[in-house]
C-alpha cells in the first residue's frame, strides 16, 4: 500500500531477523509451548527482514530440521513457530505498519503504552497489509476495511478478481437446474 524503501534500508547487521511482534491469542502461549522465555514474545513470519549471513553462519537450515525432528508435537504454526523458537534471542521488532495483520482490526490485543503510537500510525497508514486467518479480501463475506484497496491493486496488476457472490449464485443455480430438470428414470429388474 506504501513504499517499503524505509524497511528495505533498515540495518539488521547485528540480528538474524526483524519482524512485527504478533499480538494475537497465540502470543502468550507460544513461547511457553516452544520452550523459550515469554518475555522474548513472538513474531509473525509474514514479513521479515532476514540476515542471510547470520543464518548461514548458524547453519540455520540444519538447525530447523533438527528442531522439527525433536519438537514436532509442539509446532502449531509451522515455519513461524520454528523461526521463533530458534531466533527468539536474535530478533528485533519492527513497526506494525510493515505487517499490519488484519486480526488487529477485529481483536482487542493488549497494546503496551509504548507501542500505542505505532499502533495508531499503522492503522492510519499501513505499508503492508497481511490478511491472516479466514477473512480473505477475495471472499464475498470479507468485511475488511482494506478489501476495496486489495481489489483495486489486484486489478491494476492485471489480476481478474472474481465476485464470489456471483460465483456462489451460479453454483447453486447450476445444482438447482440439475435437480429440477432431472429426468425421471425407472429401474427395470
Cite the ranges covered by each PLM segment.
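GT-A fold catalytic core of metal-dependent nucleotide-sugar glycosyltransferases
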Residues: 1-27, 49-50
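A short secondary-structure junction signal
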Residues: 1-6, 28-32, 58-63, 141
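Short alpha-helical segments and helix-capping/turn motifs at coil-helix boundaries
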Residues: 4, 33, 112-116
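Short, flexible, glycine/charge-rich loop motifs used to bind or transfer phosphoryl groups or to couple energy/partner
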Residues: 6-9, 37-38, 82-83, 118-119
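Extracellular/periplasmic catalytic domains that process cell-envelope and extracellular macromolecules
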Residues: 11-12, 40-42, 120-123
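Surface-exposed acidic, glycine/proline-enriched linker/cap segments
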Residues: 24-38
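A recurrent flexible, glycine/aromatic-enriched loop bordering the glycosyltransferase active site
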Residues: 36-47
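A glycosyltransferase accessory/donor-loop signature
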Residues: 45, 50-189
Amino acid at each position: 500500500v506504501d513504499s517499503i524503501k524505509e524497511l528495505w534500508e533498515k540495518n539488521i547487521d547485528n540480528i538474524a531477523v526483524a519482524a512485527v511482534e504478533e499480538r494475537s491469542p497465540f502470543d502468550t502461549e507460544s513461547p511457553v509451548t516452544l520452550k523459550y522465555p515469554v518475555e522474548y514474545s513472538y513474531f509473525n513470519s509474514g514479513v521479515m527482514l532476514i540476515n542471510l549471513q547470520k543464518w548461514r553462519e548458524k547453519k540455520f537450515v540444519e538447525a530447523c530440521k533438527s528442531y522439527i525432528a525433536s519438537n514436532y508435537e509442539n509446532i502449531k504454526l509451522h515455519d513461524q513457530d520454528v523461526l521463533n523458537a530458534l531466533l527468539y534471542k536474535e530478533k528485533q521488532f519492527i513497526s506494525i505498519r510493515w505487517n499490519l495483520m488484519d486480526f488487529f482490526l477485529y481483536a482487542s490485543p493488549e497494546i503496551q503504552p509504548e507501542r500505542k503510537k505505532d499502533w495508531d500510525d499503522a492503522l492510519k497508514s499501513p505499508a503492508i497489509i497481511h490478511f491472516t486467518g479466514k477473512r480473505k479480501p477475495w471472499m464475498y463475506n470479507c468485511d475488511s476495511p482494506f478489501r476495496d484497496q486489495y481489489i483495486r491493486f489486484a486489478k491494476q496488476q492485471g489480476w481478474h478478481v472474481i465476485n464470489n457472490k456471483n460465483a456462489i449464485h451460479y453454483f447453486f443455480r447450476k445444482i438447482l437446474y440439475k435437480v429440477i430438470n432431472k429426468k425421471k428414470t425407472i429401474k427395470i429388474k
